[in-house]
Amino acid sequence: MPGVDPRPRPYHVATMTPDRQFRSPVRHFWRWLIPALLLWAFALQGTRGLWSPDEGRYVDVALEMLKSGDWLRPHVNDEFAHVTKPPLTYWAVASSVELFGRHEWAARLPHALAFALSVLLVGAMGRRLVPERPWLPALVYATFVLPYVAAHVITTDTLLAFFTTAYAAAFVEARARRDSRGAGGYVAAGWAAAFASAILPGTP
């Protein structure tokens, strides 16, 4: 037929790139999961009593600090020195109980805060290391079983994890700002967090 080109015409199939797939409603659902998990971490802190012997021992030492006013020499039962752990965990528990009262959730609150801050720090590292999906590392950490469970138990683990994450995040940020004047401050913050992770909370 005159005026009709018999040659086949190319056609294009519209496809979604991997990045656009992550922008679907499913992605937004997963992003809501992080604050939901953090809320869950705080909400369940007072649903059970203290576990013996570890949680009871940490709280006993913290209460002795409040009773005696001596925050430098941990004691148990007014007489037995308890120096097997550095004092930061005791200080955190004692401060929380002093502010909010003698409740199980108050004793565990510092660990829930440390977990929440660790999730935010992992997200900050994700912003630098995975800029196309900065929320993904935070989601992965928030859904790990052990960090989440540790946020509900009074031990040194969660505080130690927080300071370890803090110095990693500080050095990642310092690396990203290496050509700017603010890099030195992040390096100093990283070394301070490294010192705190090694000296203050102690190891399990």
Cite the ranges covered by each PLM segment.
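Short, positively charged and aromatic/hydrophobic N-terminal segments
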Residues: 11-12
